[in-house]
């Protein structure tokens, strides 16, 4: 008799990478798990979500929230993305991203990144324009270290950060395309 547990993870392939990237890019919200510095207990909240051009999740949160203080004390966190449909919610794809979050308002050298993130976030979440410039709100960028994708029953994958990354060479062409597409749509 063996004590070895059967590995239920599937090998990561292009279909899994595509599904993972799609889950992040199409998510309008996520569950954000942070660590309470007072006692180390987990705390979960919901945040509106968008992505930076490189595919990194970004969110806007208020300094008045407990998760803001938690992230300031310890940037380690996780995001759960995935939209359940009708029926059994466990039958739908979902993914937990594990990493750290960075407050973009703390660094003057991140001003260009902050402007880019704000623009993309507000295109995805236009109602946030009402409070995005309030002094107690800040944009945070999530840096993924690894992810756990559940693509549905029997389809589990352990992903590396590189599985979710947009290749550096593609970023500029994507940025150029996005700018032209937005200008074209605004002109129509």
Q: How would you name each of these model-derived features?
A:
Residues 2-72, 80:
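An N-terminal domain-cap segment
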Residues 2-9, 14, 129-188:
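C-terminal edge-of-domain segments
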Residues 6-7, 66-127, 134, 144:
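Short, structured beta-strand-loop surface elements
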Residues 23, 120-124, 180, 184-188:
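Residues that form generic nucleotide/phosphate-binding pockets
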Residues 37, 64, 84, 147, ...:
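Residue-level signature for short turns and capping positions that connect secondary-structure elements
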Residues 40, 107, 148-150:
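Residue-level signal for secondary-structure boundary sites
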Residues 44-48, 96-98, 139-141:
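Conserved hydrophobic/aromatic beta-strand scaffold that supports enzyme active sites
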């Amino acid at each position: 008799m063996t004590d070895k547990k059967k590995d239920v993870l599937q090998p990561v392939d292009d279909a899994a990478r595509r599904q993972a990237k799609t889950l992040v890019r199409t998510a309008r919200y996520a569950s954000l798990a942070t660590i309470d510095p007072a006692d180390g207990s987990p705390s979960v909240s919901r945040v509106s979500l968008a992505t930076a051009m490189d595919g990194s999740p970004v969110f806007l949160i208020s300094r008045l929230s407990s998760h803001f203080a938690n992230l300031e004390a310890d940037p380690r966190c996780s995001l759960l993305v995935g939209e359940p449909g009708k029926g059994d919610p466990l039958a739908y794809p979902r993914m937990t991203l594990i990493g750290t979050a960075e407050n973009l308002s703390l660094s003057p050298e991140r001003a260009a990144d902050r402007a880019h993130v704000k623009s993309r976030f507000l295109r995805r979440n236009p109602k946030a324009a009402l409070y995005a410039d309030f002094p107690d709100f800040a944009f945070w960028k999530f840096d993924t270290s690894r992810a756990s994708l559940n693509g549905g029953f029997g389809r589990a994958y352990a992903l590396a950060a590189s599985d979710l990354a947009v290749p550096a060479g593609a970023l500029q062409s994507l940025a150029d395309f996005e700018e032209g597409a937005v200008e074209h749509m605004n002109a129509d």
